[in-house]
């Protein structure tokens, strides 16, 4: 288990979390991606800089941090899993599955819907009408094959989106970016079998 943190977790907290887990937990400090940025943020009262940087991390930087793994299972700290196939990676491998999600989601953030499609049209070769279809995976709990995201063309596309100042300014989340890339690559987004969370 990997627990990414912003350098704000004490040794006592790490020890406590580790003592409550049957699995070994590797704590990785990713505070380098959460430094102060001087940009005028739209809707700053709703979404602070840290939230926007968390979205950036989860759409782009994470793939460099997990490059030595074949698969990842992302579970945000607010997720409680009640029923789940513990052999999901083996299932994905034997069935050549790239991506599982807990549920689908539309992008409901107005500023993202107003600005991201236009940015994609101007800065990528994506068929925006086809890929920005609101058939996106909800990203608080998913499993994915890492090498899909480590592909140089996919990483380049993610970099173009994630490292744009507009991602921070307008609070583009990882849902439409992850979903849009999967749609662009024509990767089927599947629902986890036998999941309750």
What feature does the model see in each segment?
Residues 1-6:
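Short internal beta-strands
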Residues 8-9, 32-34, 78-80, 106, ...:
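Conserved beta-strand elements of beta-rich interaction domains across eukaryotes
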Residues 12-13, 17-69:
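Active-site-proximal specificity loops/subdomain of glycosyltransferases
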Residues 15-23, 72, 86-94:
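Short, surface-exposed basic-aromatic patches at helix termini and helix-loop junctions that form
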Residues 42-55, 79-179, 184:
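Conserved catalytic core of nucleotide-sugar-dependent glycosyltransferases
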Residues 68-82:
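Short beta-strand-to-loop acidic/aromatic patch adjacent to the donor-nucleotide binding site
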